[in-house]
Amino acid sequence: MTNIRKNHPLMKIMNSSFIDLPAPSNISSWWNFGSLLGACLALQIITGLFLAMHYTADTMTAFSSVTHICRDVNYGWVIRYLHANGASMFFLCLFIHIGRGLYYGSFTLSETWNVGIILLFTVMATAFMGYVLPWGQMSFWGATVITNLLSAIPYIGTNLVEWIWGGFSVDKATLTRFFAFHFILPFIIAALVMVHLLFLHETGSNNPLGTSSDSDKIPFHPYYTIKDLLGLMFLILLTMTLVLFSPDLLGDPDNYTPANPLNTPPHIKPEWYFLFAYAILRSIPNKLGGVLALVFSILILAIIPMLHTAKQRSMTFRPLSQSVFWVLTADLFILTWIGGQPVEHPFITIGQMASILYFSLILIIMPMASLIENKMLKW
């Protein structure tokens, strides 16, 4: 058996990635979220495949087909809510995974980090297009508002929007292509995950101390397979609690009303995981400025390795940087809350202040805190 595991062309790839992989002996539970993201992706692909068997990508029947899945298909409601809430779990794990990378300085593994940023954008695009498919009020108006942002691009903007729509408004052509993209993108994500892991295994994992682990490695199996399984149990517990007790907790009631181009909902807002970026978009009165702020709120992750001024890799022994990190976390919670509120006083002002603070913390305050710590340590 050992020979097959180590010599078979396919098995030896699996073996070197998940069984005999040398891993740092001290990685904490914050390192569990990579495998949890893999589990979420698998869940989304499987549930999505079964949903696609019953869904019809047509403006006349899309809403009815989703209703049919929930009412008439065997356990269709479970599959549908697993898929919807699975997306929320995906983003929850994604945000924690990125946060862990920031806190422990994993962004110094630049290839892995950059592929991760591409993955984040791809997952966000997939989730956005998936939200359009049930063809409820929020699906339709969300698609209209977000695709319309591209019209802010000078000269080619309007043509670009109409090209994406496949007409002069969000209609049948838009829904059909969004379904096609929503189906193919998870497989592209799976391929990018392979690249992400390939780059990670070139350098090996970081650890909570931010030091080299070369002198102290342990095999991935059984130590971290068991540890990942424990994390998976907690994830399953949380997901199933959500699906079976309050499946619509994170959804929008407006999406239970069929799409109506003649009636705009009072508050157009995306799913909770996009609210922080939506708040940043809305906090700038200028359309192009808002779109740029929206893009840069995510793209800013790409320049974080360049802003790393500390002499230590991890924040484990840097209390000042830790404080800045948790202020940033709190700021993201505030932005998420503001994104779900109507555009009126005092929410506008709070949103603008939180947006300025978000960019200031990453671009100015964090590098300065690191420099102060260097001075305190006489480095």
From Swiss-Prot:
Entry's transmembrane regions: 33-53, 77-98, 113-133, 178-198, 226-246, 288-308, 320-340, 347-367
Topological category with respect to the lipid bilayer: Multi-pass membrane protein
Binding positions for heme b b562 per the UniProt entry: H83, H182
GO cellular component: mitochondrial inner membrane; respiratory chain complex III
SUPFAM superfamilies on file: a domain/subunit of cytochrome bc1 complex (Ubiquinol-cytochrome c reductase) (SSF81648), Transmembrane di-heme cytochromes (SSF81342)
Residues that coordinate or bind heme b b566: H97, H196
Subunit structure, as described in the record: The cytochrome bc1 complex contains 11 subunits: 3 respiratory subunits (MT-CYB, CYC1 and UQCRFS1), 2 core proteins (UQCRC1 and UQCRC2) and 6 low-molecular weight proteins (UQCRH/QCR6, UQCRB/QCR7, UQCRQ/QCR8, UQCR10/QCR9, UQCR11/QCR10 and a cleavage product of UQCRFS1). This cytochrome bc1 complex then forms a dimer.
Protein name (record): Cytochrome b
The organism of origin for this protein: Hapalemur griseus (Gray gentle lemur)
